[in-house]
């Protein structure tokens, strides 16, 4: 098995909607392989939402005007293409726009349904004069990439329903470059620098995560041909390496109380790795191993950055009754009696 130097990924946030990501070190050639794949996926395959059709009261087609509105319908539709919207619904949803002049019509005048969010409410859509009035319905759908208006034209659509070009992609721009980087004595490793700019409906971080997930799913098809095929594997991260080292520690190093220690040894639990493979229920099945011992074990494992098999990630030692996180000691009164902790189990 060939084990490669594990790359790290860091993010430099430039603005709310632009970040620069650095992935290094990569095996020679993989900077361009990974950079090109991520760029194309980011630009074409990130799910988003967009307006797909519009109906304006009194308007039959886009080549006309609305009384009292400065812009013609074609310009109004062009402005609506700049609407940044996100939707949690998989089915098409309808938004409503009703405004009477004088004044500007902005995206903030649109009333979206639950599950739909407008991210640029200040965007100008049209301008009304004293007698101007506009009432419209906008259909929003989820999709990927770019879909021309002709493909959004539904068969049997009502008269006056105007299809719109839909730009679903929430990613505006992606560039990348590959520099050389050094690992020990080798200087031919790749350093991938990826610059991602998005719309306000998604962060660059989430967009990159989505692209990564898509590529993993697709490359998984090739892996399924032979799951035992040999390939380059990346080494563990520093945190994972620490965990691996911790798994080999004997439970003696946890400095448990006599009762907890003897109960675990009698059950055949000798290392931290064997301990973290157990659930709370497994431990409670051990004779004389009660909730007090469970709490003690969870606190000790938390100090190593580990937990029992079914412990929630949100475990907080400060919430454990009788434990003082400041001093790292247990209370000697009430529920956590020192005598109860000091005694050994009765065989």
Curated annotation (Swiss-Prot):
The keyword Transferase applies. The N-terminal domain is essential for RNAP assembly and basal transcription, whereas the C-terminal domain is involved in interaction with transcriptional regulators and with upstream promoter elements. Its EC number is 2.7.7.6. The gene is rpoA. Residues 243-347 are annotated as: Alpha C-terminal domain (alpha-CTD). Belongs to the RNA polymerase alpha chain family. Residues 1-226 are annotated as: Alpha N-terminal domain (alpha-NTD). It comes from Mycobacterium leprae (strain TN). DNA-dependent RNA polymerase catalyzes the transcription of DNA into RNA using the four ribonucleoside triphosphates as substrates. This is DNA-directed RNA polymerase subunit alpha.
């Amino acid at each position: 098995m060939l084990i490669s130097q594990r790359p790290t990924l860091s993010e430099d946030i430039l603005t709310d909607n632009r970040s620069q990501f650095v992935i290094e070190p990569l095996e020679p050639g993989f900077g361009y392989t990974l950079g090109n794949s991520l760029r194309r996926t980011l630009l074409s395959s990130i799910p988003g939402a967009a307006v797909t059709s519009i109906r304006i009261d009194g308007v039959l087609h886009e080549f006309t005007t609305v009384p009292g509105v400065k812009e013609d319908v074609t310009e109004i539709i062009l402005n609506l293409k700049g609407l940044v919207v996100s939707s949690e619904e998989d089915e098409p949803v309808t938004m409503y726009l009703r405004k009477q002049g004088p004044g500007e019509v902005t995206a903030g005048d649109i009333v979206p349904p639950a599950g739909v969010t407008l991210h640029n409410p200040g965007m100008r859509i049209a301008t009304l004069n004293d007698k101007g009035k506009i009432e419209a319905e906008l259909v929003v759908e989820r999709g990927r990439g770019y879909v021309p208006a002709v493909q959004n034209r539904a068969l049997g659509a009502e008269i006056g329903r105007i299809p719109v070009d839909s730009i679903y992609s929430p990613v505006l721009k992606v560039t990348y470059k590959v520099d050389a980087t050094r690992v020990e004595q080798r200087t031919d490793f790749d350093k991938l620098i990826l610059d991602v700019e998005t719309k306000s409906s998604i962060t660059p971080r989430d967009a990159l995560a989505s692209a990564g997930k898509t590529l993993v799913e697709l490359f998984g098809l090739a892996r399924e041909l032979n799951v035992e095929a040999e390939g380059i594997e990346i080494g563990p991260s520093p945190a994972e390496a620490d965990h691996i080292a911790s798994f080999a520690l004997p439970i003696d190093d946890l400095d448990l109380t006599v009762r907890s220690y003897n109960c675990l040894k009698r059950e055949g639990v000798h290392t931290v790795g064997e301990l973290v493979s157990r659930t709370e229920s497994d431990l409670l099945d051990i004779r004389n191993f009660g909730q007090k011992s469970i709490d003690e074990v969870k606190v000790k494992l938390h100090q190593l950055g580990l937990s029992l098999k079914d412990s929630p990630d949100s475990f907080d030692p400060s919430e454990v009754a009788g434990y003082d996180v400041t001093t790292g000691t247990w209370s000697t009164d009430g529920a956590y009696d020192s005598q109860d902790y000091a005694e050994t189990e009765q065989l």
